[in-house]
Amino acid sequence: MTTATIDAAGYSTAERTAIIVSCMLGFALDLYDVLIMPFLMGSIQKSLGISLAQVSSVTSLTLIGSVIGGALFGYLGDHVGRKQALQLALLMFAAGSIASAFAWSYWSLAILRFVTGIGLGGEWGAGMVLFNEAWNKERRGIGSAFIQGSAVLAAASASIVGVWATTSYSLEWGWRIALLTGGSPILLMIFIRSFMPESKAWQQFDALRKRGAIETAAAKTNTLVAMFRGPLLPISIMCLFWMMAYMFCYYGIVVFMPTLMQRTLDAPPEIVRNISVIASVVGGLSYLTMGALNDRFGRRFGALLPGLSWAVMAVALFLYSHEKYQGSILHFPIFWIYLSFVIGNSALGVVGTWLSEIYPIDVRSTAVSFIYMAGRGVGSLAPVVVPLVAGLFGGSLAAGMTVVAPAILIFLLMTVLLPETRGRELAVSAKTRPQHVAA
């Protein structure tokens, strides 16, 4: 039995451009669909005559669906191809979002948003794996940072469209029109079908697999099981804890920071808006900076430095979160705490690249998709946990938000323990069966 290394063929500049543009748009649409819902919740509640708890549960169901979608489309990405899985995920995503606009009751909306979540969950992993398999290994970090940095575009678009739709149209139609904009992934599907190539590394691997000329760990079982077997078991457990800790901290702070500033610390709405705009700019620059640094110093560095910024944020939140706005942003402690938080967020820029480099090609799509979406699923619990903890401390929202501190420590610990992979080839390295030649 011999070991064969199958190198991915080169990609043209046009092909690489199509890949990164589609991934940036895909991630932006993914996050846009999640972030626009808070702007629509009030209108949906009144239009359908449902409770706030019910409309809030719709977002939770969407995130639960995304965990299932991550596993499903990750599996398909390893079996039918990265591009095909991405197209199928976008189709379900778009169909669910468009259909949601015509929901007539709580249950119809809940089911359709759950379906939307399944499609949404498959988009990120399939696109991110294809990107990393096609991109220059020396610049994967900065490329991944550009993709994740499109979150800034998503947040801005969600706020603009959400406010525009609910204020420009009737109560019955405003939220429906906003949800219809989620059908834009159909346009991205057409773009992908026309311009974006399939992963050449996967095509070569699949050709050998179909000929029976290659042996992989996933050949004897499904890819979701294979990622938890043998030497991948401890790695997968660490990756899950790593991603879950990140998402719990992210949602535990980002959901409540505007409320903390405005209602608890007496910051006027325009000051909260200005701080959010400044934070978005700093966050975008941080993504790009960390992307360049993790290409130079390693994936661990690209996650560790932002994680330490989060640690500073947690300590400062504990010490200074009681200091109210006194007329100056620069003398408002929560402003600097928020900047420390958004700098820490840039750890997400290394996630897709690090996970893609950690896992072998036969389980890569499944592992990357499932781990990311499982993390997001756990992160969705933070908006429930924070108020509960706040209640234990006399209703102090800031005290409730400090519940993210253990998650930060777990994130830092897993960052130190995970293997460094900078510069790793994502071509296939697998055992091939010997070929018998007739005499």
Regions found by a protein language model. Give the residues of each.
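Cytoplasmic membrane-interface "Motif A"-like loop-to-helix N-cap segments
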Residues: H79-L90, R296-L308
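Glycine-rich segments within core transmembrane alpha-helices of 12-TM secondary carriers
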Residues: G141-T166, P185, Y372-P383
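Cytoplasmic helix-loop-helix junction between adjacent transmembrane helices
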Residues: L112-G149
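Cytosolic juxtamembrane N-terminal segment immediately preceding the first transmembrane helix
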Residues: M1-Y32
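Helix-breaking motifs and short loop linkers at transmembrane-helix boundaries and internal kinks
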Residues: G49, G81, F102-S108, N136, ...
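Extracytoplasmic gate region of multi-pass secondary transporters
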Residues: M37-P38, P231-G284, P383
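Conserved MFS/SLC helix-loop-helix module at the cytosolic interface between two early adjacent transmembrane helices
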Residues: I68-W104
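C-terminal ends and interior cores of transmembrane alpha-helices
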Residues: L91-W104, S309-Q326
